[in-house]
């Protein structure tokens, strides 16, 4: 086996020197953790917006309201899943990037233990959703907002722009007080990375995400962002 080192690799050092460098990085990592804790504390204190409009979705067992999606719990995390004619693979498949996100949602028992439910919502008809959900092997609750104002009201279906084709993914958080519902938080774009393990794991590796925007050593493999994302059964074997 060849031991020749690539010119683009970082310095190769003895274990004690590596430990010293690692400890310096750890100081910064701990500072970042404390900053994120402080940010989360601010997020918990954001003002909330009441949701007075009645929304009804198509679920696997019939019509369900936004209140029903809480399943009796106080909190609801809702992923706005892109699934419309502007999405690659329509009408048989949902957005590849959104599929990557849902692949990373773990067993919901852990959220339920903290009085929190999770659901995905798409504007696609329920039949399309069922087909893609079965193909992907998911158990995550997923309902259809087809024929409702839900996507438009929450800014997820809009007029096309130079940045998107008219449908946008995102993550909303709702809070229930009795039968009153409030929207407490929303994020989209890179904010959604917070719920994904793929990006966090890749960030721990020497190559990183291997995307062109990253500051990596010269010669490290990089491709345009998003373009490498596929539905999990579409990657080259």
Located regions from the model:
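Non-globular targeting/processing and membrane-anchoring segments
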Residues: 2-114, 131-137, 141, 148-237
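Short His-Asn-centered micro-motif
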Residues: 79-80, 118-124, 129, 145
């Amino acid at each position: 086996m060849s031991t020749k080192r690539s010119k683009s690799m970082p310095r190769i050092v003895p274990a004690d020197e590596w430990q010293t460098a690692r400890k310096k990085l750890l100081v910064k990592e701990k500072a970042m953790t404390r900053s994120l804790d402080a940010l989360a504390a601010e997020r918990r204190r954001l003002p909330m917006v009441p949701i007075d409009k009645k929304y009804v979705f198509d679920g696997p067992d019939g019509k369900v309201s936004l209140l029903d999606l809480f399943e009796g719990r106080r909190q609801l995390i809702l992923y706005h899943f892109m699934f419309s004619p502007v999405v690659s693979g329509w009408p048989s498949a949902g957005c590849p990037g959104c599929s990557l996100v849902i692949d990373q949602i773990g067993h919901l028992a852990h959220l339920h233990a903290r009085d929190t439910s999770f659901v995905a919502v798409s504007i696609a008809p329920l039949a399309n959703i069922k087909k893609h959900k079965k193909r992907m092997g998911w158990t995550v609750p997923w309902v259809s907002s087809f024929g409702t104002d839900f996507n438009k009201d929450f800014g997820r279906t809009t007029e096309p722009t130079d940045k998107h084709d008219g449908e946008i993914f995102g993550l909303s958080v709702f809070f229930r007080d009795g039968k009153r519902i409030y929207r407490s938080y929303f994020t989209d774009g890179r904010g959604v990375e917070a719920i994904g393990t793929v990006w966090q794991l890749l960030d721990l590796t020497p190559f990183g995400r291997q995307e062109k925007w990253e500051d990596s050593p010269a010669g490290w493999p990089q491709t345009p962002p998003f373009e490498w994302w596929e539905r999990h059964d579409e990657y080259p074997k």
